[in-house]
Curated annotation (Swiss-Prot):
Catalytic center residues: C151 (nucleophile)
Function: Involved in the cellular defense against the biological effects of O6-methylguanine (O6-MeG) and O4-methylthymine (O4-MeT) in DNA. Repairs the methylated nucleobase in DNA by stoichiometrically transferring the methyl group to a cysteine residue in the enzyme. This is a suicide reaction: the enzyme is irreversibly inactivated.
Predominant place of localization: nucleus
Keyword Transport assigned: no
Record organism: Debaryomyces hansenii (strain ATCC 36239 / CBS 767 / BCRC 21394 / JCM 1990 / NBRC 0083 / IGC 2968)
Protein name per the record: Methylated-DNA--protein-cysteine methyltransferase
Binding site for DNA: Y120, R134
Gene transcribed to yield this protein: MGT1
Cross-referenced Pfam families: DNA_binding_1
Alphabetically ordered keywords of this record: DNA damage, DNA repair, DNA-binding, Methyltransferase, Nucleus, Transferase
Length: 191
């Protein structure tokens, strides 16, 4: 099996750090959030451990223009999560993690709008599995592309936060950030 080379970088955003993994063409494969770079790197390596043909390399020096563009767009999205849906059209991505069902859940979440939340049970019903809200919750927990797949928008039926792979305080912050009115960004013109 041929090796697939992926690049990773840790970027700073105002409230945390993000570890981003792309291919050499800038397609997003993975994103994780947290305050400790060393923990982000260890977690990434564990998450990729089953993919023996994926070779993870840190970006040293300046990244190529495609990778740099993805990193910058992710940073903008992280600073203002109301831009997530816009970035779905601007950042190329590839799901390598997850089962077919998990990917269906993630795609459904990618169709939610900023400042909207959805409950696990409603998502399960939408997928034709009305009694599988826990399965949907587990799929959210298995998401490996933070923010881009907006699992922070998924809540319990009562509107409570039941968990978040990157921590409940971060989920609360993201939901709060999405409640602010969106202002047009001239730098976000579609390409």
């Amino acid at each position: 099996m041929k090796n697939i080379y992926l690049l990773y970088s840790i970027i700073d955003v105002s409230y945390t750090k993000a570890l981003i993994v792309t291919n050499t063409h800038g397609s997003l494969y993975y994103a994780s959030l947290g305050d400790k770079p060393e923990v982000l790197i260890v977690t990434m390596k564990k998450d990729f451990a089953r993919f023996k043909n994926y070779v993870l390399q840190p970006i040293v020096g300046k990244a190529n223009s495609e990778v740099s563009e993805t990193l910058e767009k992710f940073r903008l999205m992280a600073e203002d999560p109301r831009l997530i849906n816009t970035m779905h059209k601007q950042i190329p991505y590839e799901f390598i993690f997850g089962t077919e069902l998990q990917r269906k859940v993630w795609n459904q979440l990618m169709n939610t709008n900023a400042s909207e939340t959805v409950c696990y049970s409603q998502m399960a019903s939408n997928l034709g599995m009305p009694k599988s809200s826990r399965v949907v919750g587990a799929a959210c927990g298995a998401n490996k592309i933070a923010l881009f797949v907006p699992c922070h928008r998924a809540l319990t039926k009562s509107g409570q936060i039941s968990g978040y792979r990157w921590g409940v305080p971060l989920k609360q912050r993201l939901l709060k950030l999405e409640q602010k009115p969106l202002q047009k960004e001239s730098s976000l013109k579609e390409k």
